[in-house]
């Protein structure tokens, strides 16, 4: 049997696989903020990035390793292809962490071998132990993944896994890379590895899955029943295509259905010992933080953290919940840190009160960041009587979007109305302090603003998404605008909130432009799509 750590380990890859969601690019400060919150959530392993991809990714992993990788904190992991250059860069990046891991991978499915790697099975069986052994010479904790395991020949994969463990791999990860497996198939795959790999007792079995068929969480739970003890997942299930297995759904399934899963971990059915080490009260604020910083909204009916997860429309349901919440709720909302708290912050509230509430929401702001957020708070408080948690989150989100400010919005004025052509005049301030203005006409005020901004910056782009939603209720609510721009196949998102949605749209467009300009300077490799150089064997 595979090595059993005594509970289910949670491996969070929000900062690596999650960031590969279209438009979900994060800067260093945003990655660090998420990593710090993941540590408060008490995930076991943080996959902080792909260090070889770009200098920016290397710096992010190294900074997280230095600031979050404390002796009592999570393992800090980096991804590396099965090459010496990747593995050495990964080892250097995670070196400041007290607990380090290198996660290296190579495809094992015939379709990947033939069409992507152009390598034979014999070559793979030579590369894997060589590269795992090299990684193990640099760190004590090495994870090896059989990419596209769900479509691999099991007998060949058993050989690869055995060779990887023999070379020093401490965790063997089985990815359903394209989300193709069904729960029964995936469970059988894990059971087969547990039964047919002779040295599997020296390694923990891990699983990684995508949600292309909506089965990722179900597959993982079936894997746990068959011996998997590490789950690779992301906050809010973000990730490429249809996303990854959702951390909050997995953790709460194991929490709520503990008695069902206890037996599969060799425990008594009525054991109250948690199956994971997750601090569940941090789930909701972690979800909000990731949503705010990536700009990826959580769908209202999303399990656990969606806006409707604890809402009841039916009169019968409402009556039952009012009498006893257990009639229609299987989870106490407080378990995930969700409260009905409506804070009494207003224009007379001081900096300390704002800072304290932001910290409760998972935001650690100091210095200029706190000053900027407080200034925006006071500006909003002059226009709104009641400031809610969502308003505060929108303020912080807007601040985070402006960290790399190549352009700053200095002013915007629009003129529009029925039977009038919408006209906008915008003023931008560049990073060297120069101000420039331009006017433009459009089909509406937002289009006119975007035309004027594009005329000023002269950066080719295509507007592919514009959305606006109310942050809170009421006529004085802030409108939150999301804009996505596309250039050369890459998406860049911008977000802003204001009680004037046209101003919010202008700021969101500028934020997206800043990310686009920054992205042109730091274009990373994609770990699965980058060409694999010949390893030094």
Swiss-Prot record:
GO molecular function: 2-isopropylmalate synthase activity; acetyl-CoA C-acetyltransferase activity; manganese ion binding
Binding site for Mn(2+): 17, 208, 210, 244
InterPro entries given in the database record: 2-IPM_HCS-like, 2-isopropylmalate_synth_dimer, AIPM/Hcit_synth_CS, Aldolase_TIM, LeuA/HCS_post-cat, LeuA_allosteric_dom_sf, LeuA_bact_synth, PYR_CT
Recorded name of the encoding gene: leuA
Quaternary structure (record): Homodimer.
Family note: Belongs to the alpha-IPM synthase/homocitrate synthase family. LeuA type 1 subfamily.
Lineage: Bacteria, Bacillati, Cyanobacteriota, Cyanophyceae, Synechococcales
Signal peptide coordinates: none
GO cellular component, one term: cytoplasm
CDD domains: DRE_TIM_IPMS
Species of the source: Synechococcus sp. (strain RCC307)
Name of the protein in question: 2-isopropylmalate synthase
């Amino acid at each position: 049997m595979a090595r059993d750590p005594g509970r289910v380990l949670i491996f969070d890859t929000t900062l690596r696989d999650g960031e590969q969601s279209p438009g979900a690019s994060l800067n260093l400060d945003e990655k660090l903020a998420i990593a710090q919150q993941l540590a408060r959530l008490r995930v076991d392993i943080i996959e902080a990035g792909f260090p070889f991809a770009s200098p920016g990714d290397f710096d992010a992993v190294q900074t997280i390793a230095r600031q979050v990788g404390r002796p009592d904190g999570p393992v800090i992991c980096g991804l590396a292809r099965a090459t010496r250059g990747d593995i050495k860069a990964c080892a250097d990046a995670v070196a400041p962490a007290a607990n380090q891991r290198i996660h290296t991978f190579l495809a094992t499915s015939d379709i990947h071998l033939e069409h992507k790697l152009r390598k034979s099975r014999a070559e793979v069986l030579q590369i894997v132990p060589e590269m795992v052994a090299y990684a193990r010479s640099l760190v004590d904790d090495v994870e090896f993944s059989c990419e596209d395991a769900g479509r691999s020949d099991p007998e060949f994969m058993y050989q690869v896994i055995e060779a990887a463990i023999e070379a020093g791999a401490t965790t063997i990860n089985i990815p359903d890379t394209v989300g193709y497996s069904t729960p029964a198939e995936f469970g059988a795959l894990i059971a087969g590895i547990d039964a047919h790999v002779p040295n599997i007792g020296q390694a923990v079995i891990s699983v990684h899955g995508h949600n292309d068929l909506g089965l990722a969480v179900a597959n993982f739970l079936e894997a746990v029943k068959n011996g998997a003890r590490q789950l690779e997942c992301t906050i809010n299930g973000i990730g490429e295509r249809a996303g990854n297995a959702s951390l909050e759904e997995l953790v709460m399934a194991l929490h709520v259905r503990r008695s069902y899963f206890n037996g599969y971990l060799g425990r008594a059915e009525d054991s109250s010992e948690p199956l994971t080490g997750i601090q569940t009260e941090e789930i909701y604020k972690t979800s909000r933080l990731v949503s705010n910083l990536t700009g990826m909204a959580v769908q209202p009916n999303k399990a656990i953290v969606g806006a409707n997860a604890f809402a009841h429309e039916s009169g019968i349901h409402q009556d039952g919940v009012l009498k006893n919440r257990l009639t229609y709720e299987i989870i106490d909302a407080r378990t995930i840190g969700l409260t009905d708290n409506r804070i009494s912050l207003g224009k007379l509230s001081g900096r300390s009160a704002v800072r304290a509430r932001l910290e409760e929401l998972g935001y650690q702001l100091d210095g200029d960041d706190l000053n900027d957020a407080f200034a925006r708070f006071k500006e909003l408080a002059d226009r709104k009587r009641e400031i809610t948690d969502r308003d505060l989150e929108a303020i912080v989100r807007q601040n985070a979007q402006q960290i790399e400010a190549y352009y700053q919005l200095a002013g915007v004025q629009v003129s529009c109305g029925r039977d009038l052509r919408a006209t906008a005049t915008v003023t931008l301030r560049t990073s060297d302090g120069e101000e420039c203005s331009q006017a433009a006409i459009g089909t509406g005020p937002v289009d006119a603003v975007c035309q004027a901004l594009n005329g000023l910056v002269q950066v080719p782009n295509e507007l592919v998404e514009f959305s606006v939603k109310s942050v809170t209720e009421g006529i004085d609510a802030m409108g939150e605008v999301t804009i996505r721009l596309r250039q050369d196949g890459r998406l860049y998102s911008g977000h802003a909130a204001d009680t004037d949605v046209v101003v919010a749209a202008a700021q969101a467009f500028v934020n997206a432009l800043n990310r686009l300009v920054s992205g042109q300077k730091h274009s990373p490799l994609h770990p699965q799509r980058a060409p694999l150089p010949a390893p030094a064997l």
